[in-house]
Amino acid sequence: MKGVYFVSGIDTDIGKTVATGMLAKQLLQQGKSVITQKPVQTGCQDIAEDIAVHRKIMGIPMQEADEQRLTMPEIFSHPASPHLAARLDGRGLDLDKIRTATQELAAQYEVVLVEGAGGLMVPLTEKLLTIDHIQQQAYPVILVTSGRLGSINHTLLSFVVLKQYGIRLHSLVFNHIHDSRDAHVAQDSLNYLQCRLKADFPEAEWMELAKTGAV
């Protein structure tokens, strides 16, 4: 595993932050030089909260790249979709700043895990969707899903749009932390999505994030 990977989810609050942190920790344990990035963080003032969570999970302090804001180039105060948060803060989202920051990280680290805001179709600006940015940068995607009710539908919709945009799915992370309380729903979701992944993206990896937080 080497290069820049975009971590997205089938929905908001699906466990992207924990999954990103755990994947980074696993790569560190394998001896990889790895960093995480949150290009757009909303609902914060000075520090991207998700980056702080990543570092805690990884077991490392805030890095020089964090202090330089390369890992958190755009922070908005209102907890909303990036396009709305930027508007409410009275300024635009600087895509060039984001691209440059990611490129600088990629030059310093073997692996860069870029955690997106929400799902693939979240608007970054009034005209640009998250998936447009992913396509433009040719990032492979790590998609986080779960066993909660509705996850099959949301995951398959994500599969459709990834195929439509010609984006490579590197892996599907099944997050047990957000499993349905109904064990039948959770297990069926796992079985169904595992089969669909093999059929739709045979080259993609299947990963599971246990309730303990281990990948």
Curated annotation (Swiss-Prot):
Substrate binds at residue 42. The keyword Ligase applies. One of its GO terms (molecular function) is magnesium ion binding. Transmembrane segments: none annotated. Its main location: cytoplasm. One of its GO terms (biological process) is biotin biosynthetic process. The keyword Metal-binding applies. It comes from the Bacteria. SUPFAM superfamilies: P-loop containing nucleoside triphosphate hydrolases. ATP binds at residues 13-18, 50, 115-118, 175-176. Its EC number is 6.3.3.3. It is found in: Cytoplasm. Pfam families: AAA_26 (PF13500). One of its GO terms (cellular component) is cytosol. Its cofactor is Mg(2+). It catalyses: (7R,8S)-7,8-diammoniononanoate + CO2 + ATP = (4R,5S)-dethiobiotin + ADP + phosphate + 3 H(+). Catalyzes a mechanistically unusual reaction, the ATP-dependent insertion of CO2 between the N7 and N8 nitrogen atoms of 7,8-diaminopelargonic acid (DAPA, also called 7,8-diammoniononanoate) to form a ureido ring. PANTHER family: ATP-DEPENDENT DETHIOBIOTIN SYNTHETASE BIOD 2, DETHIOBIOTIN SYNTHETASE. NCBIfam families: bioD. This is ATP-dependent dethiobiotin synthetase BioD. The gene is bioD.
